[in-house]
Amino acid sequence: MQKQQRSLSLITYNIHKGFSFSKRFLLPQMREALLTLNPDFVFLQEVQGEHRLREKRIVAWPDAPQFEYIAEKIWPHYLYAKNAIYHSGHHGNAILSKYPFERFENINLSSMNRASRSILHSQIKIGEGLNQINVHLLCVHLGLFKAERSSQCSALMQRISEAVPEHEPLLMAGDFNDWRRHLSKPLAEELGINEAFYSMKGHHARSFPAIKPAFCVDRIYFRGMRVSEAYCLKGKPWRMLSDHLPLLARFEFI
């Protein structure tokens, strides 16, 4: 494996369709902040694919879908899962990547048309020849309500059990809405999947609301790699952008 491919970095970020907690449209500022960090992957939740009313009303609204607008300078490869569909448009999850995708599938977990709940599962290959490694990327957004989330967690664990071989590295991140912290234990005990921030700090990151974080809803999970860095991006500009704070982690191949 080439030296520059011995580690991978990712950010997970619920961008609230480009709006701040106070409903200001700050997508350009979000993009610039993400560009300064330059990770290998960006996992986005609540990314707007289209909104015909807002694009007419908001001067700074981009001509391209939000995921393309964010990706265009650094991440040549991107996937978008259109999960929440309504009269004026749609939103969902996205993965931006510096590496081409080998395959992908979106598992829609939404119980309502306007709710964006899904598992966007993609695969990339790192390295060349005999050193090539297949890496699984899962961008996740789960529901707000306990019963809904319990069913979605079961579907998530089943998906991993059936579709991700144990010998292939897995990186999974997103907005799990798991403020009661029920998910990490079964993931670790049943599937050998650990959470990056918890592994480094001994506790989950408080990422919501961004202005005064109190709830641990966003996570970065991994298996088959070693976490070397994990951060919750606090302070300026992050606390003034989306209603969530982003998480950043770096992993090394074992």
Task: Please place each PLM-identified region on the residue numbering.
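Active-site regions of metal-assisted phosphoester/phosphodiester hydrolases
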Residues: 1-41, 62, 68-69, 73, ...
